[in-house]
Swiss-Prot record:
It comes from Shigella flexneri. Belongs to the SfsA family. This is Sugar fermentation stimulation protein A. Binds to DNA non-specifically. Could be a regulatory factor involved in maltose metabolism. Keywords: DNA-binding. Pfam families: SfsA (PF03749), SfsA_N (PF17746). GO terms for molecular function: DNA binding. CDD domains: SfsA-like_bacterial. The lineage of its organism: Bacteria, Pseudomonadati, Pseudomonadota, Gammaproteobacteria, Enterobacterales. Residues 201-220 bind DNA.
C-alpha cells in the first residue's frame, strides 16, 4: 500500500485531548493535526519525534491534516493511524501474503456475529471449508523489541475474545490477528502488565481453538505492507 499523495513531514510539539497534535513543519509553520488513535500511544508521541501526515482535500474538515506515522528519534517507524491495521490486513489476505489465511474465495467485512452482537472485522468463506472469522488488532507498544497488546485496559477487546471462543466452539475457524505496525518489534506477547484479564482470556482462547497470528508490516514514509510472521508468546 503506497501513500498517495505522498506524506508530508513535521516535528511533533505535543499530542493533547487524545485526538489532536501540534507540529512544526520544516519551513517553520505550526499545524494542528487530527490524531486517529484513542489509545495511550506509549512511545509513539514523544515531543521531537518526526511525524508524517496526510492532507485531505475535504474543505469542510476542521483539521484537514491527519497524523499517519511516527518516526521515533531512534529511527523506528510506527503507524499511529489505527484504521491502517484493517486496510493492510485486507490487502495482505487478498494478495495471499498471509499463508494461514489463503485459499478462500470470499471476503466480507463488518459481519455481525456472536451472542454479544459484535461485528467481526473479516469473514472468509470457501466451498467445503468452515467460515473463518478474523478480529484484527493494531500493535504499536514496544519495549526492547517486544511488542505488546493492549496499551490500555480494553473491555472491548475482552468481549471480542469471548465472541471468538464461541465461534470456535461452533466448529468455525476463529482467528485473532495482531497487525504489528512498529518497525522495531521482533516478537509479540499480550500485555499482562497492563490488562491481565485480556492476557488470561487470550490464553484461554488459544486453548479453546482460537488461532493467534502476528504479522509485522514493513513501514516507510512511502508506504506499508504486512510481510513477516512474528513469534507469539503467551
Amino acid at each position: 500500500m503506497e501513500f498517495s499523495p505522498p506524506l508530508q513531514r513535521a516535528t511533533l510539539i505535543q499530542r493533547y485531548k487524545r485526538f489532536l497534535a501540534d507540529v512544526i513543519t520544516p519551513d517553520g509553520r505550526e499545524l494542528t493535526l487530527h490524531c486517529p488513535n484513542t489509545g495511550a500511544m506509549t512511545g509513539c508521541a514523544t515531543p521531537g519525534d518526526t511525524v508524517w501526515y496526510s492532507t485531505s482535500d475535504n474543505t469542510k474538515r476542521k483539521y484537514p491534516h491527519t497524523w499517519e506515522l511516527t518516526q521515533s528519534q531512534s529511527g523506528a517507524f510506527i503507524c499511529v493511524n489505527t484504521l491502517w491495521a484493517n486496510r493492510l490486513t485486507k490487502e495482505a489476505i487478498l494478495n495471499e501474503s498471509i499463508s494461514e489465511l489463503s485459499g478462500y474465495s470470499s471476503l466480507k467485512s463488518e459481519v455481525k456475529y456472536g451472542s454479544e452482537r459484535s461485528r467481526i472485522d473479516f469473514m472468509l468463506q470457501a466451498d467445503s471449508r468452515p467460515d473463518c472469522y478474523i478480529e484484527v488488532k493494531s500493535v504499536t507498544l514496544a519495549e526492547n523489541e517486544q511488542g505488546y497488546f493492549p496499551d490500555a485496559v480494553t473491555e472491548r477487546g475482552q468481549k471480542h475474545l469471548r465472541e471468538l471462543m464461541s465461534v470456535a466452539a461452533e466448529g468455525q475457524r476463529a482467528v485473532i490477528f495482531f497487525a504489528v505496525l512498529h518497525s522495531a518489534i521482533t516478537r509479540f506477547s499480550p500485555a499482562r502488565h497492563i490488562d491481565e484479564k485480556y492476557a488470561q482470556l487470550l490464553s484461554e482462547a488459544q486453548q479453546r481453538g482460537v488461532e493467534i497470528l502476528a504479522y509485522k508490516a514493513e513501514i516507510s514514509a512511502e508506504g506499508m505492507a504486512l510481510k513477516k510472521s512474528l513469534p507469539v508468546t503467551l
